[in-house]
Swiss-Prot record:
GO terms for molecular function: chromate transmembrane transporter activity. The gene is srpC. It comes from Synechococcus elongatus (strain ATCC 33912 / PCC 7942 / FACHB-805) (Anacystis nidulans R2). GO terms for cellular component: plasma membrane. May function in the active transport of chromate into the cell under sulfur-deficient conditions. Induction: By sulfur deprivation. This is Probable chromate transport protein. It comes from the Bacteria. Belongs to the chromate ion transporter (CHR) (TC 2.A.51) family. The chain crosses the membrane at residues 22-42, 90-110, 119-139, 146-166, 201-221, 231-251, 261-281, 282-302, 327-347, 370-390. It is a multi-pass membrane protein. One of its GO terms (biological process) is response to chromate. It is found in: Cell membrane.
Length: 393
């Protein structure tokens, strides 16, 4: 705790206003997904401005990787916390998320107003197919990065993928159970007692609290709040990890959107700056207008904020504990398997004729071979044009 307190009392080389303005700009112009966004933060804040030290940045990045939540948003929370505490974390996070939230709300309004028109349907006819290709290549890259050669991890991956395909939803208890299984195999319980380190799981005990939140309520906004609070606690490994979870709840359980509307929501997230999970604002708007968008976005980011700032003071001491990284590794592999399963589930809904199959295939190849030269937003725009062309024939 002393390390964290001393950190907060060091006079920073920047004001909270300057840091907030930086993240407001990044949230408005930061395209490229979570990896690109955290790269921009390192370039701008560590290398160029030197507001944050390399050690502080790496600590924040590590915490963002091991705790549930969207990577870029959590790193922004931590960097706001470093010198300005809880208030700094909240203001910086709000500044980072606000621009993309306003964009998706505007798109939600346009979608609601014009979604029934032929040209809008034609646009999303192509966009939905491209989304499948992009998610497929993302799942492939995540699989190569996270699973490795371990038979245990491959088993977990395949079980979660198959479960998602069969149930058409992500099973949270299976995700958490996967992390627990890897932990038990690598570190049997007698080893914990021997080492006396059961108290090392800083932050992880909070996760079941979010999982246990009931979703039964008579209020629509209450249902939205409870569901997206749960969603915010289970974004492990990548922002795309939330896709199968959201599909299971929004489409299968609550029936708020149909499959095509959900795919359109994912597409909107890919063409806007900021974190991918801001699609929750778009979904919330379609379900319950502007109040729904606000409730969904706030509920989504509250767990991410809490699971960043609460463990932060203790992270210097416990952050490198191998048990934490082992548990998170198992959960991440399970989430990656769920993403792979979601590709199949969503593909059934979107790739229903030759043109959509070709658009999806071209998007996949483009993301794979031309990822840096042809960013995802541009692929989506090209797919939209292709959709208009094919739709009219």
């Amino acid at each position: 705790m002393k390390d964290s307190d001393s950190l907060l009392h060091v006079h920073p080389a920047y004001s909270l206003k300057q840091l907030t303005q930086y993240f407001l700009k990044l949230g408005a112009l930061g395209f490229g997904g979570p990896i690109a966004l955290v790269g921009y933060m390192h370039r701008d804040l560590v290398e160029e401005r030197q507001w944050v030290s390399e050690a502080e940045y790496q600590e924040g990045l590590t915490l963002a990787q091991v705790a549930p939540g969207p990577l870029a948003a959590q790193l922004s929370f931590y960097l706001g916390y470093v010198h300005y505490g809880f208030l700094g974390s909240a203001l910086v996070g709000l500044a980072f998320v606000l621009p993309s939230f306003l964009i998706v709300v505007a798109l939600g309004w346009a979608y609601t107003l014009y979604g029934g028109l032929n040209w809008m349907q034609a646009v999303f006819y192509g966009v939905g197919a491209a989304v499948i290709g992009i998610i497929a290549i993302s799942a492939y890259k995540l699989t190569r990065k996270t699973v490795g050669t371990s038979w245990l991890l491959w088993s977990i991956y395949l079980v979660n993928a198959a479960t998602t395909i069969v149930t058409e939803s992500e099973r949270v208890e299976l995700i958490l159970g996967s992390g627990a299984l890897v932990l038990l195999v690598k570190f049997p319980p007698k080893h914990w007692i021997k080492q006396n380190r059961l108290n090392s799981f800083i932050g992880l005990p909070l996760i079941p609290l979010f999982a246990a939140v009931p979703t039964a309520t008579t209020s629509l906004l209450g249902q939205i709040a409870l569901f997206f609070t749960q969603a915010g606690a289970f974004v492990f490994g990548s922002g795309l990890a939330i896709v199968p979870f959201l599909y299971g709840g929004v489409v299968k359980d609550f029936g708020w959107l149909n499959s095509q509307q959900f795919l359109d929501a994912v597409a909107v997230a890919m063409i806007t700056p900021g974190p991918v999970v801001i699609t929750t604002g778009f979904i919330g708007f379609l379900v319950a207008g502007f109040p729904g968008a606000c409730v969904a976005a706030i509920a989504m980011f509250i767990p991410c904020y809490l699971l960043t700032v609460i463990p932060a003071p203790y992270f210097k001491k416990h952050g490198k504990n191998p048990k934490i990284s082992t548990f998170v590794n198992g959960v991440t592999v399970a989430a990656t398997g769920a993403i792979a399963g979601a590709v199949v589930v969503l593909g059934r809904q979107s790739l229903h004729d030759l043109p959509t199959f070709l658009i999806g295939l071209i998007a996949l190849i483009s993301s794979w071979k031309l990822g840096k030269k042809l960013p995802e937003p541009l692929i989506i725009v090209i797919a939209a044009i292709a959709g208009v062309i094919f739709w009219s024939k």
